[in-house]
Amino acid sequence: FQHGGLIEEPKFLPQKIVEEKYSTKRYLWTDEKGLGQHFLTRYKKILYPSIKNNKQILIFSTLISYKKYTESNLIKNNHPFLDQNYDFFKYLNKENKNRVLIKLFPHKTSENIKKIWKKKFRNNINFAEIHSSPKVYFYNSRLAVINDISTPLYELMYIGVPFILISDNNFNELETKFVKKLKKLEKLKILYTSPIKAAEFVNNNYDTIDDWWKIVSKEKNFINFKNTLFTEKKDYINSITKELINI
């Protein structure tokens, strides 16, 4: 069962090769019958009134690694001092800065990243506990800010939490069809290459984020991209149970 994002989308992934060689059956989130969503079904959908009542802006950072570059791309958001989230936070207005909660990736390097944040912006930043589950933070957020194509993107899409993605990556490591659909999110003000423009959008639209999200989440390009991430099935438990019994 798939338990993390970005399995089918990369052009090359050792994990995929191993799974295809040694697994009898693979249940992916994109399974045509909707039998691969086991991981995602632990989440409940968020309701629009909840979004409107939430105040928090959640900055959810990707893994920043000092080595192991087979796992991390050589892009700004994987660099401890060049992460675009720094500029995004810098250009938020004072009110929005106070609404920010930063959730660093649960990894040993994150303690050092936390120190960099504090050095840049002193102690005027709220941090979530590094190894805590992101689940509660998703449901308490009016807007989530991510900087990578990874599991949080899929989780946010599934739950329905408004989010923006900031990344100047050209995504050459991903399949072309996937990237084409992803880049169409720019016109919907979801995907940004510039953290400054992303901050301007949030400053200008914070009060109406829920209304914006209600509109864009019904757009054709949004739905097409969402459908590349996972397939939903209402009677999933019954269906997967029957499937496994018959294997």
Model-identified regions with their sequence ranges:
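A short helix->loop->beta-strand "cap" motif at the edges of active sites that frequently abuts
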Residues: 23-24, 97, 160-162
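C-terminal alpha-helical cap of glycosyltransferases
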Residues: 226-247
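Conserved catalytic-core segment of nucleotide-activated headgroup transferases in glycan assembly
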Residues: 40-119
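Donor nucleotide-activated moiety binding/catalytic core segment of transferases
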Residues: 103-159, 169-170
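Active-site and donor-binding regions of nucleotide-sugar-utilizing enzymes
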Residues: 1-40, 153
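Short, charged/polar "capping" segments at the starts of alpha-helices
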Residues: 8-10, 33-37, 67-68, 108-116, ...
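Catalytic binding pocket for nucleotide-activated donors in carbohydrate/polymer assembly enzymes
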Residues: 34-39, 52, 61, 118, ...
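Generic beta-sheet signal
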Residues: 1, 29, 103, 166-168
